[in-house]
Amino acid sequence: MVTRVLIDHRQGGRHEAGVRHPEKQHRPDNPSQPKPSWIRVKAPNHPVYHQTQALMRENRLTTVCEEAACPNIGECWSQRHATMMIMGDTCTRACSFCNVKTGLPHALDGDEPARVADAVARLGLRHVVITSVDRDDLNDGGAAHIAAVIKAVRLAAPETTIEVLTPDFLRKPGAAETVAEARPDVFNHNLETVPRLYPAIRPGARYFQSLRLLDQVKRLDPSIFTKSGLMVGLGEDRAEIAQVMDDLRIAEVDFITLGQYLQPTPKHAAVDRFVTPDEFSDYASMARSKGFLMVSSSPLTRSSYHADADFAALRAARMEQQQRIA
């Protein structure tokens, strides 16, 4: 993954760092640290990668894999796993960790649910992850559109399980109910970091609003798996991670992911340190001890990384838990 010049997978060209983030241009550059050996990934060059890319273009779909410059894009797309990002490619927030473009979004595309559903069916996905930009400009934060996508995928690919990774719907009453009523198999909302770092890393969000959202969805429909993720390496400490895990368990969140923060450009938040694989293993043990049904913790873990296999394991873990209780 490069820092000063980013590969634009959508156009096959390049763009200078910062063009996507005009609100960050007044900031001084943050130095980029050399990545350790356990972070390095191969450049995407598999035939199936290009087939997946072509299908995304044909259906005019945006993916978070590209927009967020995910390091796992080569591996995932080579297995026909792509996380579709709905409601446009422009976010109304300006988080200091995120590579998604910031600005004034276009109106929602009413044909998008059908195009997403078509792509899911043609890829033959057993499990699909659908995420979105924040849409603070919409009265419901885009909740009805997310629900429409879920319903369209159910019709086109009834055997496919659906995971949604949503915004926080800050000050959008009724949004959680709208999404929960569409009954995704997994409702994911990432806390991203520890509460102390929110003003610097996630300034447009509120930690306890994100927790309330996860708790609310679980209360609305306990059959929906809930999931949340954290980036580490931003300056948090072990005790803070433990507290976030406790908060998530109080909200009855089933699945936690932990991965290394990687700096997209010099204008984004700097990496405080690279967390070692052994530390990720320690975090995984800690999370399991606190009662999470499923834990994914590694340097390259992202919300949708290995989501298909993880969902199967998550469902099996719930069945085992229910059998023990019975």
UniProtKB/Swiss-Prot annotation:
Domain Radical SAM core residues, every copy: 77-293
Domain of life: Bacteria
SUPFAM superfamilies in the cross-refs: Radical SAM enzymes
UniProt GO MF annotations: 4 iron, 4 sulfur cluster binding; lipoate synthase activity; metal ion binding
Region named Disordered: 1-37
Binding site for [4Fe-4S] cluster 2: C91, C95, C98
Known EC number: 2.8.1.8
Family per record: Belongs to the radical SAM superfamily. Lipoyl synthase family.
Official protein name in the record: Lipoyl synthase
